[in-house]
Amino acid sequence: MSEGISLSAEFIDRVKASVKPHWGKLGWVTYKRTYARWLPEKGRSENWDETVKRVVEGNINLDPRLQDSPSLELKQSLTEEAERLYKLIYGLGATPSGRNLWISGTDYQRRTGDSLNNCWFVAIRPQKYGDSKIVPSYLGKQEKAVSMPFSFLFDELMKGGGVGFSVARSNISQIPRVDFAIDLQVVVDESSESYDASVKVGAVGKNELVQDADSIYYRLPDTREGWVLANALLIDLHFAQTNPDRKQKLILDLSDIRPYGAEIHGFGGTASGPMPLISMLLDINEVLNNKAGGRLTSVDAADICNLIGKAVVAGNVRRSAELALGSNDDQDFISMKQDQEKLMHHRWASNNSVAVDSAFSGYQPIAAGIRENGEPGIVNLDLSKNYGRIVDGYQAGIDGDVEGTNPCGEISLANGEPCNLFEVFPLIAEEQGWDLQEVFALAARYAKRVTFSPYDWEISREIIQKNRRIGISMSGIQDWLLTRLGNRVVTGFKDDFDPETHEAIKVPVYDKRAIKMVDQLYKAVVKADQDYSKTLGCNESIKHTTVKPSGTVAKLAGASEGMHFHYGAYLIQRIRFQNSDPLLPALKACGYRTEADIYTENTTCVEFPVKAVGADNPNFASAGTVSIAEQFATQAFLQTYWSDNAVSCTITFQDSEGDQVESLLRQYRFIIKSTSLLPYFGGSLQQAPKEPIDKETYEKRSQEITGNVEEVFSQLNSDVKDLELVDQTDCEGGACPIK
């Protein structure tokens, strides 16, 4: 293999001298606590220029042409492309996904093929493990097992990805009868540092172990794979097909699992100890044992996925993003979060949605649930399978393998398929002198290279090689359109009638300039993909564009999040920090208000005054003032003219608008592929993450801030390794993974 592409120190110095990163009010602080990796040789975390260098080099070297004796001409061409990408990302005119900011260019990326993708989807039905990195020793690679989708979900969650999963009837009906109840014993050596804490959650001392001929003993290695394989063995023992010897006692030895607080190499962070895994295994065994002699339901399967997610949250990842997708007439699934005890115990771990098609009409109970608690969301698989952009019309089976979506709902996915995201801030990129068509072309090529990663699971490798799906997103959409057009994209509504129900509806009128703007950029992405695919000799991407919810990445640039409207024209935005976080002294020294967090011990809440882009424009609207109808119409605009995947949107609504939910879901059934809704709270909670304020309060609070946090932090020189992130909010629905 040839020596890779690298960016010279001289080039980086020139960019640093000529380009100023477009940090938002929370931008640099958010970057430093979320994406800056620890540099052991320097005894500090990365600076932004170092992060961007790592990320760009990690990506450009995925070009498969570099594998075999590349020409000097090719290396020069890719070096020039890397330099353009570096300048673009350093200035924050565009960024790869948060996952790429954290992982790209690391040893972990080189070891772990799945590490660059944000989110995944898997169907909960018996599947073969195939030629994957994880295959239980008792199974043949081509042998179907009930455990496989749960293993896939567990593995990807522990790698920091989010996972959407389908418990629709068509999948759950393929799971065979639960044949055996399993007597599970979890043991820990008395000499283990974790012994006392493990016993408290249900383990027993190893000296108490009673092993007989009917039992299976497995000592878990201290690895991610060991956790997955233990759970797989437990699940598969319940089924005769994968337990032909009819063994009904399982002993899992967790003595080798590293204790709480120990360092985790690779992904980063610190270990949780064996306790969350012990609780998970015992709880999953209870779910399965309760169905011995019967069959698992969609709720049982979702519970197992939620219990896995709960264990991962308690572990190193700190958030496991899950979306459970059920059948639209499965009332037990739709109402499963009404069980308050189980909701508090584990059912909080997923956002729940139902699959519909355009002929579906039963929105009344769904709308009632949304008004009550914001669930379920809606995923229209019929539209996803047969449409790209809505304006391009019906294309039968254009994405026929689609079965679900990622947790945030912006990418329609086949079984085992991941999201592959990159986002552009069009207003910022234009202000920095970029041609937007070039920016979106660079974005498409970046995402295309990610599809050449060495994926760990066979189902993923096969579908990625077939689809090469990419998701080029734009963010700060409201900022861009309001600034460039002087108005919002929806300029009004006209009266009309639904062609099927004859119900009176109000059809949105869009600014034609906006249609032209996004259409040109869509075509630039498609053209870039076509050209690069031809060069690389691979399939063109099955779909190309999306709108991701953004959140953390949008905070870097200070842009509105995805298609969402700013939460208010002026805000107090609160971020929580561990009391030991070295950023806190710098923030206090700069005049930011801080107070003890009322929800979590040893945590400080820091308040940032924020002014939205365009706040002074008379046509500015916030999430607290824009109507539910305009939000639906805006999502429909982007689904029609920009996104051939889907558009992630959490529509917020006032109490007075709740009665419009049902009719609007019905009106847009031929356009919107996925959506979710939440009541607008407006910062009424104590220490709310976002609290709208007036202009006078904003100006007063801004005057209290007297220093530059980045400069003060550098002067204090008090970096600390492996801090836990506290309460990082990536998107309205809380569905995104933390990095």
Curated annotation (Swiss-Prot):
<dbReference type="Pfam" id="PF21995">
    <property type="entry name" value="RNR-II_ins_dom"/>
</dbReference>
<dbReference type="InterPro" id="IPR040763">
    <property type="entry name" value="RNR_alpha_hel"/>
</dbReference>
<feature type="region of interest" description="Effector region-2">
    <location>
        <begin position="168"/>
        <end position="313"/>
    </location>
</feature>
<dbReference type="GO" id="GO:0008998">
    <property type="term" value="F:ribonucleoside-triphosphate reductase (thioredoxin) activity"/>
</dbReference>
<keyword id="KW-0560">Oxidoreductase</keyword>
<dbReference type="GO" id="GO:0000166">
    <property type="term" value="F:nucleotide binding"/>
</dbReference>
<keyword id="KW-0170">Cobalt</keyword>
<comment type="subunit">
    <text>Monomer.</text>
</comment>
<dbReference type="GO" id="GO:0004748">
    <property type="term" value="F:ribonucleoside-diphosphate reductase activity, thioredoxin disulfide as acceptor"/>
</dbReference>
<feature type="active site">
    <location>
        <position position="408"/>
    </location>
</feature>
<feature type="active site">
    <location>
        <position position="410"/>
    </location>
</feature>
<keyword id="KW-0676">Redox-active center</keyword>
<dbReference type="GO" id="GO:0006260">
    <property type="term" value="P:DNA replication"/>
</dbReference>
<feature type="region of interest" description="Adenosylcobalamin-binding-1">
    <location>
        <begin position="565"/>
        <end position="626"/>
    </location>
</feature>
<keyword id="KW-0021">Allosteric enzyme</keyword>
<feature type="disulfide bond" description="Redox-active">
    <location>
        <begin position="119"/>
        <end position="419"/>
    </location>
</feature>
<dbReference type="GO" id="GO:0031419">
    <property type="term" value="F:cobalamin binding"/>
</dbReference>
<feature type="region of interest" description="Effector region-1">
    <location>
        <begin position="147"/>
        <end position="158"/>
    </location>
</feature>
<feature type="region of interest" description="Adenosylcobalamin-binding-2">
    <location>
        <begin position="685"/>
        <end position="724"/>
    </location>
</feature>
<dbReference type="InterPro" id="IPR013345">
    <property type="entry name" value="RTP_Rdtase_AdoCbl-dep"/>
</dbReference>
<keyword id="KW-0235">DNA replication</keyword>
<protein>
    <recommendedName>
        <fullName>Adenosylcobalamin-dependent ribonucleoside-triphosphate reductase</fullName>
        <ecNumber>1.17.4.2</ecNumber>
    </recommendedName>
</protein>
<keyword id="KW-0846">Cobalamin</keyword>
<keyword id="KW-1015">Disulfide bond</keyword>
<dbReference type="Pfam" id="PF17975">
    <property type="entry name" value="RNR_Alpha"/>
</dbReference>
<dbReference type="InterPro" id="IPR054158">
    <property type="entry name" value="RNR-II_ins_dom"/>
</dbReference>
<dbReference type="InterPro" id="IPR050862">
    <property type="entry name" value="RdRp_reductase_class-2"/>
</dbReference>
<comment type="similarity">
    <text>Belongs to the class II ribonucleoside-triphosphate reductase family.</text>
</comment>
